[in-house]
């Protein structure tokens, strides 16, 4: 195990993580909830209809709920992302966009025309957050149109205005939107930690392991919900 990183401020506490523990100040930390929508976490949602295994989504929802309770009590900022597009799919891009070719939601709708207008469209059930993760007063909701939460969104300005330096990631899918957002945050000088049991992959189990390996080796840190709650659950309310 590597040596702990030197604390950045007096308010920091040490969060157990891989490859080394790191100091985290709740006042400059945001928990990012990536795409916990019916599309990704509910039977009959886009990911399920596209043939992906979503059996782990219910456990992830439960874990995230516990993390958010602790985060709010500790004074952390909570940010929810919802992925999708306008109901006419202009934001998704046409054939001139690689997103048109690679988005599995768009490909599923082209293969099944009866689903057109239902997947990842604002105003539709698929786009909405799952019932168990309803935002609370003070939480922030942001919209994104691509895998990374930093692309064409207000995330960076929201974080900088609040002095946020550390991002704790939860949500679906680890190997797509979670990793993409954490990577872009790294390039913008944000510290990123993913809670591995509060995320779920799109695809076989090995892609979860590969994404976590990439994160802890090159772009950030990996911790668990138990370590997060154990570290911050004893703090006085923020």
Curated annotation (Swiss-Prot):
It comes from the Bacteria. It catalyses: (Z)-3-ureidoacrylate + H2O + H(+) = (Z)-3-aminoacrylate + NH4(+) + CO2; (Z)-3-ureidoacrylate + H2O = (Z)-3-aminoacrylate + carbamate + H(+); (Z)-2-methylureidoacrylate + H2O + H(+) = (Z)-2-methylaminoacrylate + NH4(+) + CO2. Keywords: Hydrolase. It holds the Pfam family Isochorismatase. InterPro entries: Isochorismatase-like_dom, Isochorismatase-like_hydrls, Isochorismatase-like_sf, RutB. GO terms for molecular function: hydrolase activity, acting on carbon-nitrogen (but not peptide) bonds, in linear amides. It is an enzyme of class 3 (hydrolase). Its EC number is 3.5.1.110. The active site is at 35 (proton acceptor), 144, 177 (nucleophile). GO terms for biological process: nitrogen utilization; uracil catabolic process. Hydrolyzes ureidoacrylate to form aminoacrylate and carbamate. The carbamate hydrolyzes spontaneously, thereby releasing one of the nitrogen atoms of the pyrimidine ring as ammonia and one of its carbon atoms as CO2. Belongs to the isochorismatase family. RutB subfamily. This is Ureidoacrylate amidohydrolase RutB. It comes from Caulobacter vibrioides (strain NA1000 / CB15N). The gene is rutB.
